[in-house]
Every structure is written in structure tokens, then in C-alpha cells.
């Protein structure tokens, strides 16, 4: 303990549980989360990295610690040193050599001491602090933050209001039966961050202004910057050999191909349809509009360039499970980020048969593990990791051909898994099936039936215009005939989709529908990356003018529809 120091509790709270818990296991878990995810505590921080006990850096930090704090923690229990890596902020005043030294002073008490090697400001907490728990009952834990008595209270306001809240949330949500995957667990985190910053600033950020796609440019661009950085670090760490040529299957906007080319990896992208950005910003990138038929590869016929030795699948949908299969036939490595669940010939169904008995997992978890099992059956050396990208689907599968080769009977294994069925590629043009293609006469007939019911549901009048009532969708659904339902089902839609598409007639909100009154505009959250659209005059006739007994509520001059 720091000689002569006393500690005081600055904030504490009790967490209650429904059954008896293991306090030590819970405490160790939150300490682990606290050290590993400082970026969840402070937006100044990108990540943290554990310092190796056998390194020169470990000894340098401890020497600086001893000089600064006047005691040596080398003999303390479970001593750890964590490097805190800050975000690359403008006018940065934070240290590039910031660390936290921590140790268990008691079984349920950990001390934390900040250290910098360059004298600059620490990006995390600048004063020593402690995390502890008490055990009031068998089913509760009292979480505490402590500070040294002589430390200024001002230094700990953020800890009291924000940091403690996050730590308490972790404590309440702990499930020791579940194992959590760590982010970028296969990589040197510090090296990854340097690579990511380089790709983002040198190649990514400048593309935001010229973005022509409908997606959010910052999310799309920074996500692909993260994926490109990850693949680069896999190669640098020898987890994957540098490819002679890669192919990004289902490359979408093509940005990942562009970024990988920029950092020195040769390769191209394939997608069933081109994107607008291919002809503008990415006109010099090798992006090919063509369908991918994995069964051509399975039949040993040429489909990709002959020197391709890395297959990439980034949200490749129905081709996802085929990528390990095609890689096996080509005897090459693959990198895969599964997203929408597909099996070899359609939507994936979670029957859990490959997971073993009594395992309950989500559709995505089952699909992900099934895809891993496909790669393992083919004999790949498989590794799994979690990417640091702005996406809900960020688990990746890395498949490498082992030195001894893949399984000896690749063709038999593939035939066994695919059962001789035929793959159906996605069409180039995707048919719109959202109830808009219901024949006009049927669409107007159904709309009129629903309109009359909503209008007569209430006698309410707003400024001289009968506005009808707010009707639960379940009541409106009861009005539909079997023929009506079939028309909607054939368009992959239902009642709610139908009503939303009759925008000038109905407003749908929280499982109810009412008549649209354009005098009462609905405020919609506009996507920040899209410019505000000018009001347009529609060619469709005004429904209210034709069918409402009081006519159009806004009048011919102000109405956006034809009168």
C-alpha cells in the first residue's frame, strides 16, 4: 500500500441477484472488463494493451512507478500493467506512453495507479483509485470506488457519474456461464490501431465527401478501413501469408478492394451488380460485374483468376457457406465475415443439430457455428475473432490451409455436405416485393375498404375535417379476405407494409393506423448524411379529394397531389 495513505469511498451501490453468487468470480470478471475495455468508460480511449512481464517496458514502467510513488509493487499479488492507448484527437495533449499499474491488495480489492513515461497528461484517470466489493448477503454485492483521502474530489466527478455507472452495469449483467469473445484477440492491438489510423486518414476520410451510395458514408468507409486493417495485420503477424491475389466475393461498393490495393495487396472484387461508385471514385479499381456460381468451382472449372490464393467474403449472404468450399477446391485461404444466415441452398434454419444436446443459441450464433463446422470438416486451420468495426455482425472466420494439407477426401466431403443440390445465384435485378406490385384495381379496392373503416371508426373532427379514429392493426386485419391476404403474401408483405405504402392515405404508428392529415406533419428523423429533399408535386391523384366526404384537408393550392 502507498505509505501513509488512507482511502475513502467516493461512491457505492448494492447489486441484488436472484440466487447465491460467487463474489470472487464476479469481482475478477468486472476487474477484467475494466482493464480490457477502458474505451467503454471514456471516449478519449481507443483500447488497452497488457504489457508482457518479461519485457523491458515492464521494468521501465515499474522503475518510473517506484520513483513517482515511493514504493515498489513488485511483490504485490497479481500485479498487472496495462498500456492505455488514446484516440488520435486534434490538438492532442495526452500521453502516448500512458499506463496503469494494478494489483490485488486484498482478495476483493484492487488498487490502480496511473503512470506516464513522457510527462504528458494521462488519458484515463490521473489519480490513484481502487475498486472493491463487499458482501452484505449471499445474493448481493456492494460495489465501491475509492480514492486516496488527500486527492481532490474534482478528479473523481467523472468516475462517480459515468465510470461507476458502466462498472455497475457490467456487475449486474454478469453471466459466468457464457464466455465472451474478445475484440482483435489474434492481433497486436497497438499495431492494429496504427494501421487503422493510417488507412483511415490517408485513404478513407477523403472519400466521405464524394460518396455516391445510399449508405452512411462514415459507417461504410470506417467499417471497411477496419476490415482492411485487420487483414493487413493478419498478414503482418503471419496468421495469413500475403496473398498473390485476393478476390472479394460479393464486394458491394468495392471500397474494401480499393483499400487493400492501396496498402499493397493485389486483388479484385466481384458482385452480381455494379454500384454507381464503381464508375466514379473507384473507376480505376478492378471491380467486375458478374454472378458467382460456386458449383463451377466445385466442378474444377475456372471461375476466378488462376493466381487467386485468398477468398474474402464480407457479408456475402447466400455465398457465405460456399466460400470455405470454394477455397478448399482452390486449395487457398479465406477470410469471412458471416452476416445474413444462408445454408448451401437457401435460408438457414436453426435446428441446432451440429451444436450438441441442450444448447440454446440465437439464429445467428447457430449459423456462425455451422459455417465454422463447414470449414473444419474440410480440414482448414480455423481461427475466430471479433472485429473492431461499426457493425452488429463483426465475428470473422479465418481459414488457412495447414502445412499437411486439407482433408484427404475434399470432393466426398463437399458432396456429403451439399447432397448434390443445385445452387441458385441471386438475380442481377432484385424484384421489388413490398405490396407495390399488387394490381391497381385490387390495391385501390383494399385501400378503400380500410379507409372507410378508419374514417367511420370515430366521429372526431379536426378544424372542420372528419379525421376518423386510431384503429389497431389487428382490427383492420380482420377486414381482409383470404384473397386480400394472398395478394399481400405473394408480394412478401402484410397489412402493415400495405398501409405504409399507401402513404397519402394512412399514418401507421405503434401498431395502429389513422388517416393521414398533411396539416399535421409527422416529424421524421432524417439521416444526417443525406441532403434535405425539396418538396415535390406528385402525379398521383389526391385520394382525399376523390374519396373523403370533406375533400382534401390542405386544399388544392397546398396539396402535393393532383386535383
Curated annotation (Swiss-Prot):
Domain of life: Eukaryota
Enzyme class: transferase
EC numbers: 2.1.1.211
Keyword annotations: Cytoplasm, Metal-binding, Methyltransferase, S-adenosyl-L-methionine, Transferase, tRNA processing, Zinc, Zinc-finger
InterPro entries membership: SAM-dependent_MTases_sf, tRNA_uracil_MeTrfase
Record GO terms (molecular function): tRNA (uridine) methyltransferase activity; tRNA(Ser) (uridine(44)-2'-O-)-methyltransferase activity; zinc ion binding
C3H1-type Zn finger ranges: 536-563
Enzymatic reactions: uridine(44) in tRNA(Ser) + S-adenosyl-L-methionine = 2'-O-methyluridine(44) in tRNA(Ser) + S-adenosyl-L-homocysteine + H(+)
GO biological process assignments: tRNA methylation
Localization terms from the record: Cytoplasm
Function of the protein: Probable adenosyl-L-methionine (AdoMet)-dependent tRNA (uracil-O(2)-)-methyltransferase.
Similarity section: Belongs to the TRM44 family.
Protein name (Swiss-Prot/TrEMBL): Probable tRNA (uracil-O(2)-)-methyltransferase
Originating organism: Caenorhabditis elegans
Amino acid at each position: 500500500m502507498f505509505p501513509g495513505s488512507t482511502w475513502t469511498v467516493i461512491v457505492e451501490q448494492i447489486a441484488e441477484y436472484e440466487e447465491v453468487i460467487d463474489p470472487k468470480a464476479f469481482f475478477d470478471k468486472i476487474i477484467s472488463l475494466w482493464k480490457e475495455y477502458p474505451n467503454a468508460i471514456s471516449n478519449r480511449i481507443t483500447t488497452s494493451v497488457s504489457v508482457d512481464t518479461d519485457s523491458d517496458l515492464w521494468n521501465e514502467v515499474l522503475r518510473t512507478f517506484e520513483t513517482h510513488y515511493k514504493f515498489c509493487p513488485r511483490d504485490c499479488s497479481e500485479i498487472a500493467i496495462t498500456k492505455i492507448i488514446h484516440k488520435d484527437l486534434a490538438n492532442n495533449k495526452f500521453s502516448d506512453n500512458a499506463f496503469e499499474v494494478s494489483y490485488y491488495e486484498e482478495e476483493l480489492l484492487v488498487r490502480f495507479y496511473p503512470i506516464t513515461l513522457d510527462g504528458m497528461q494521462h488519458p484515463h484517470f490521473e489519480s490513484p483509485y481502487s475498486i472493491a466489493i463487499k458482501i452484505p448477503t449471499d445474493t448481493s454485492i456492494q460495489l465501491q470506488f475509492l480514492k486516496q483521502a488527500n486527492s481532490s474530489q474534482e478528479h473523481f466527478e467523472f468516475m462517480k457519474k459515468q465510470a461507476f455507472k458502466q462498472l455497475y452495469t457490467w456487475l449486474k449483467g454478469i453471466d459466468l456461464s457464457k464466455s465472451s469473445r474478445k475484440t482483435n484477440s489474434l492481433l497486436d492491438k497497438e499495431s492494429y490501431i496504427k494501421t487503422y489510423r493510417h488507412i483511415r486518414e490517408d485513404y478513407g476520410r477523403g472519400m466521405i465527401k464524394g460518396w455516391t451510395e445510399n449508405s452512411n458514408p462514415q459507417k461504410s468507409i470506417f467499417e471497411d478501413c477496419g476490415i482492411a486493417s485487420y487483414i493487413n495485420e493478419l498478414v503482418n503477424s503471419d496468421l495469413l501469408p500475403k496473398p498473390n491475389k485476393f478476390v472479394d466475393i460479393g464486394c458491394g461498393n468495392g471500397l474494401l478492394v480499393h483499400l487493400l490495393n492501396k496498402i499493397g495487396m493485389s486483388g479484385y472484387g466481384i458482385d452480381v451488380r455494379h454500384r454507381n461508385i464503381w464508375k466514379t471514385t473507384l473507376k480505376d479499381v478492378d471491380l467486375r460485374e458478374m454472378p458467382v456460381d460456386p458449383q463451377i468451382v466445385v466442378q474444377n472449372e475456372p471461375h476466378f483468376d488462376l493466381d487467386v490464393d485468398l477468398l474474402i467474403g464480407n457479408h456475402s449472404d447466400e455465398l457465405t457457406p460456399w466460400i470455405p468450399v470454394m477455397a478448399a477446391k482452390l486449395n487457398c485461404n479465406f477470410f469471412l465475415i458471416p452476416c445474413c444466415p444462408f445454408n448451401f441452398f437457401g435460408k438457414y434454419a436453426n435446428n441446432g443439430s451440429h451444436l450438441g444436446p441442450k444448447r440454446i443459441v440465437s439464429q445467428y450464433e447457430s449459423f456462425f457455428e455451422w459455417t465454422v463446422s463447414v470449414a473444419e470438416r474440410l480440414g482448414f486451420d480455423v481461427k475466430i475473432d471479433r472485429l473492431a468495426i461499426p457493425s452488429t455482425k463483426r465475428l470473422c472466420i479465418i481459414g488457412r490451409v495447414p502445412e499437411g494439407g486439407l482433408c484427404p477426401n475434399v470432393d466426398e466431403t463437399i458432396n456429403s455436405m451439399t447432397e448434390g443440390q443445385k445452387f441458385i445465384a441471386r438475380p442481377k435485378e432484385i424484384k421489388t416485393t413490398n405490396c407495390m406490385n399488387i394490381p391497381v384495381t385490387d390495391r385501390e379496392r383494399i385501400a378503400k375498404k380500410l379507409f372507410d373503416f378508419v374514417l367511420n371508426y370515430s366521429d372526431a373532427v379536426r378544424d372542420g375535417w372528419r379525421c376518423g379514429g386510431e384503429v389497431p392493426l389487428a382490427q383492420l386485419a380482420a377486414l381482409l379476405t383470404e384473397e386480400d391476404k394472398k395478394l399481400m403474401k405473394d408480394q412478401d408483405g402484410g397489412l402493415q407494409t400495405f398501409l405504409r405504402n399507401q402513404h397519402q392515405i394512412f399514418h401507421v404508428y405503434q401498431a395502429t393506423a389513422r388517416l393521414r392529415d398533411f396539416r399535421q406533419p409527422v416529424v421524421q428523423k432524417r439521416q444526417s448524411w443525406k441532403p434535405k429533399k425539396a418538396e415535390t408535386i406528385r402525379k398521383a391523384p389526391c385520394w382525399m379529394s376523390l374519396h373523403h366526404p370533406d375533400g382534401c384537408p390542405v386544399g388544392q393550392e397546398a396539396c402535393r397531389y393532383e386535383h
